[in-house]
Amino acid sequence: MLHIAPPQAAPDFVRNSVLAHQEGPSKGWLNVDIHTLQHKNYPNIFGLGDVAALPTAKTGAAIRKQAPVVARNIAAILAKKAFDDKQYEGYSSCPLVTGYGEMVLAEFKYDNVVD
């Protein structure tokens, strides 16, 4: 069985803007801190999911862990408070079909750490 993911790219309006990395392996992806998901140059911008330059798989499982971090960080900015220590740890997962009615759920975090 073969599992192939299509090529991924951020939307044109991000890739072709000053918000994206302009060179290197993250070229075209939104330039965010990998833990806070806050843009590195524009603190009022956050990115998650298929647009962010994160060294992880762009999956629904990743978004599920990224969204609460972004929500808390935006709430902190609105309340004029510092970010708490809740950060995105790079979680992502990918279901791999191994046979009829069978699969393996591969889970990852930054540095290959899994709870």
Residue ranges and their predicted role:
Residues 4-5, 43-46, 69, 86-89, ...:
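Broad hydrophobic/π-residue packing in well-ordered secondary structure
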